[in-house]
Every structure is written in structure tokens, then in C-alpha cells.
């Protein structure tokens, strides 16, 4: 049984040293994602001129969302937004793995982000253009979902503390701090 009150405390320097390789590898992955996006845009002749055609998928099943997203891209969609399942903004954790049961939307998980990004990259290569992926990280796990999005090359991540304050009764201080931190991640 784990008793966190009896765990050995480590010096801040030792903690930072232990995390150094992990953080550098993670930052390198995010930089590589940004470069991959730039490479796709260059390969396909630059960015689109004019407004983007933005579509929403929200079946609750990531695999059905992929089917709809690919069809939308073939019909001209420039941005695919995957709507989160009802109530995910109130979860104080991020579910793990691919999900197939959501209500009014699909769970925002790192695996779901990865699955959709791959599908959009594949259809983008077929169509000769870059398809952007959008999701949402408002609510209790803003920084965590923003970090997952950066790791899986989401192009747009909407986050708004007021959503949680007005519609989910989330503590104002917490959600504003979360918004600040998640926007630092998104801005990187």
C-alpha cells in the first residue's frame, strides 16, 4: 500500500535533473510536429487563401468520427473540429485510449487525437492539401488536454475559462490559471 506521507522528499535540483531528458524529448517532439505541419503546407503549395471551411464531427465514436472527417475533407473541409462528449469539461482527469461511447461528442484523449490526426494526414496527402484538426480543452483539464494536443499535432485548440465559469460553475481562480498555462502550451 502506498502512503505518500512516508515517501522520501527530493531536492528541487534532483527533481529537475531527473525530468531533464523527458522534458527535452517532449519539447523536441512538439517542435518536430510544428515542422511537420510546415512541411505539409510547403509540399501542398502553401496555405489556403481566404476563409477556411470548418466542419464538426461528434458521433461519440472516434472511428465513426474519422469516417465523417475523411468524407468532409473530400467535400472540401479545411478544418475538422471534434466536439467533446457532454460533461468532459467536468472531469478532473483525461481518459486513456481510443473511445467509442460518447454523448453529444467524443472524448478528448491523446489516442483519439492521434487517430484523427493520422486519418486527416492520409486524406490530405490523397487530396494534396493540409487538413487542420481542432479540439477543445475548456474545463478542468485545460493544460493536460492542451499538452496532449501539442504532442499529437492538433492545429487549433480552443480554450476559454469563461465557459467553465459561466456554464460549469468551475472555480474562477483555478480555471483562469489553467487557461493561462494551457495557452502557454498552445502558443509554443
Language-model features, listed with the residues they occupy:
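Metallocofactor- and cofactor-centric catalytic cores in central/energy metabolism, strongly enriched
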Residues: 1-170
